[in-house]
């Protein structure tokens, strides 16, 4: 029977979304072949071996929660009692973090369907708007001003997905958005498998998002690198801002 690297096998079996993620699971001691822990990412394992991931290396419904939790801790922001919009909610990692930190209500918005974790669907504090583009939100979707907007969207630039949600923000409202260079950069700057490796491109797209937010009436507080990478090892950034008075 043919063999291949443990990290690649985890990806092929759908147990990790990228080799970078697979390597993190192996380092955390969460990946097994049979009952034996996988020791190294490069370990050769039979392609038909019984492999599994046991436990999690974070407490959230998805690893996306690691990103927002890091940002809020770094910023020292208390969001207890906040009404929030989660743009690109997906499984609900960001929503999970906000509820854990005391958010009063979260409007979970995603163009997909049946992605939000069941425990969040059952939470009275979560208002689910599936199959709903953030670009077409109305007062029927968001019937109150919001204190916080978070965003982890894919396949679209922030300047295209955020303007409508931002219109629901109170003066002084806060924003934490994930900058994904592969969706902000020029097409020729995006390499194989959608990866942007050029640090100069990273810096430029972060600057462009910052400038756009400030032109839109928001004061940028800080931009920090995400504590974990995206698919295929893409470096991502978290930008934080507050809404200025009109």
Which residues does each predicted region cover?
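Conserved SAM-binding loop of SAM-dependent methyltransferases across substrates and taxa
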Residues: 91-102
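A short glycine-rich, Lys/Arg-flanked "PGG" loop and its adjoining helix->strand segment in the class I
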Residues: 159-176
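S-adenosyl-L-methionine
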Residues: 107-156, 160
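Conserved class I S-adenosyl-L-methionine
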Residues: 80-90
């Amino acid at each position: 029977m043919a063999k291949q690297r443990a990290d690649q096998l985890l990806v092929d079996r759908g147990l990790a979304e990228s080799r970078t993620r697979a390597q993190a699971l192996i380092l955390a001691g969460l990946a097994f072949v049979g009952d034996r822990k996988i020791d190294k990412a490069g370990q050769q394992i039979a392609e038909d071996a019984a492999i599994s991931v046991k436990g999690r290396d974070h407490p959230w419904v998805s690893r996306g929660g690691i990103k927002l939790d890091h940002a809020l801790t770094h910023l020292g922001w208390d969001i207890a009692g906040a009404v929030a919009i989660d743009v690109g909610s997906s499984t609900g990692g960001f929503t999970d973090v906000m509820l854990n930190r005391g958010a009063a209500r979260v409007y979970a918005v995603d163009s997909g369907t049946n992605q939000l974790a069941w425990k969040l669907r059952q939470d009275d504090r979560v208002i689910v708007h599936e199959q709903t583009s953030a670009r077409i939100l109305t007062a029927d979707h968001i019937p109150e001003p919001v204190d916080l907007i978070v965003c982890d969207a894919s396949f679209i630039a922030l300047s295209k997905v955020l303007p409508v949600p931002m219109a629901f923000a109170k003066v002084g409202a806060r924003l934490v958005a994930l900058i994904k260079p592969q969706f902000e950069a020029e097409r020729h700057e995006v390499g194989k498998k959608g990866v942007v490796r050029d640090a100069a491109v990273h810096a430029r797209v972060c600057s462009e998002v910052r400038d756009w937010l400030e032109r839109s009436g928001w004061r940028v507080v800080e931009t920090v690198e995400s504590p974990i990478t995206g698919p295929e090892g893409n470096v991502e950034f978290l930008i934080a801002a507050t809404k200025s008075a009109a």
